[in-house]
């Protein structure tokens, strides 16, 4: 089993959540949003089941939560028999963006962030979100970078996030 954290700030920012979950498996960190770009999802958490031969057997975008009994039972069934035919395969792929200009803004933001220009990165990502307001991955990364205390100082502040959404942020 492998998990992937999408966090533009890297492993240092993702590590506390992996440790809190007491994960007994490897977690990799996607700092470039490559998974979203490849699979085309815009929100997390997600679940992708890949069998031992490397074949994608099932994808569930948005709403996966191992704490929910139905998701936990599904994971258990897959681990016990990963080649079962009843696991649906969702082959939808894309860039994660409907508008190619939004993708350009995202990539510009990533280049700025890698150069250490956080302000320019946030501006570019806000442009991308303005064009694609349903891209929750970028929106939440903006929030996490601009307001780390809401994400990295204990529990994630979901009430604050709801307030941001209500305010159109």
Where are these regions (language model features)?
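Thiol-/selenol-based redox modules, centered on thioredoxin-like
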Residues: 51-123, 136, 146, 151
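Alpha-solenoid helical repeat scaffolds
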Residues: 106-107, 139-142, 157
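Alpha-helical linker/edge segments of TPR/alpha-solenoid repeat scaffolds
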Residues: 144-169
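Thiol/disulfide oxidoreductase modules built on the thioredoxin-like
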Residues: 19-24, 30-74
């Amino acid at each position: 089993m492998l998990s992937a954290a999408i966090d533009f700030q890297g492993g240092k920012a993702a590590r506390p959540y992996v440790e809190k979950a007491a994960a007994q498996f490897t977690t990799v960190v996607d700092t470039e949003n490559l998974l979203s770009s490849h699979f085309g999802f815009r929100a997390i958490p997600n679940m992708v089941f890949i069998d031992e031969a490397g074949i994608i057997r099932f994808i569930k975008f948005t709403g996966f939560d191992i704490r929910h009994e139905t998701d936990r039972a599904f994971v258990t069934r897959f681990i016990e028999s990963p080649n079962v035919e009843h696991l649906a395969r969702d082959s939808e792929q894309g860039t994660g963006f409907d508008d190619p200009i939004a993708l350009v803004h995202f990539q510009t933001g990533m280049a700025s962030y890698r150069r250490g220009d956080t302000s320019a990165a946030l501006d570019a990502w806000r442009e991308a979100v303005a064009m694609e307001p349903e891209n929750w991955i970028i929106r939440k990364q903006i929030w996490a970078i601009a307001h780390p205390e809401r994400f990295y100082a204990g529990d994630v502040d979901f009430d604050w996030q709801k307030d941001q959404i209500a305010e159109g942020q």
